[in-house]
Amino acid sequence: MAQENEKELQQLKNRFHDLAERSHAQGVFTFTGFLGLSDQEVFWQEEPGLRYAGYTLYGGCDQADRVVVRFGDSGELGYETDFPVVCIHIAPLAEKFADELTHRDFLGALMNLGIERSTVGDIRAGGKQAYLFCLDSVASFICDNLIQVKHTRVRCSVTKDFQDILQEEPETVNIQVQSLRVDAVISRVYNFSREKSLALFRTGKVYVNGRLCENNSRILKSGETVNARGFGKFVLTGEARETRKGRLAVDVAVYR
């Protein structure tokens, strides 16, 4: 299993370098598929050897967790091109009889179609509908074949009308901590024990601003985004204020 994982890791690294080299040598833009946080970390590890080609990351919407990397610089190449990313609106045929559907429900239905995970980006689910970002190469297939999610019959259509609908509304909470260490803030936001918080770091499940964070004592700054895989993400939205008891009070926007 370890050898298999190492092989996949090396293949991903090679893919990044191949795409960067092809962009640079042929004077064209090249694209990855959608990358999750762990694959993005591999990209950032390799980034010093890729930056010569120029690159841009984009996931289709603000604060996307899954992104596509485009290699190539429009200033150097002399032209611009869009990312091959489209948005699909998934809605019930009969809302009255539709289930309340979760992100997991929509993702499971998509994976049952047999498509690669790398062709699918963020899924913004709410109530009985969702907005899905995917590669344009699979959009028609999804629209033609995704007809049911859980027990709900659905229709799919490519849309550009999603900017307002897709704004996830975070829950703003005020927490008090001894310090802005990332492990302490995670413990307070999710009401974890210190041991459970530290376990997230040991298993590589904490990302700060899209980068793997292995240093649990890292001090967070206002505006930084923390992803705790499996639990959600949050953003420090204000400056810390000292309380009368010497603790730090800070506002956090929590995305469940």
Where are these regions (language model features)?
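Short, well-ordered loop/turn sites that connect or cap secondary structure elements
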Residues: 200-201, 220
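Ferredoxin-like alpha/beta domains used as RNA- or RNAP-binding modules
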Residues: 1-189, 212, 219, 232-256
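Short strand-turn-strand beta-turns centered on an Asx-Gly dipeptide
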Residues: 209-210, 229
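Structural motif
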Residues: 223-224
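Forkhead-associated
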Residues: 192-193, 200
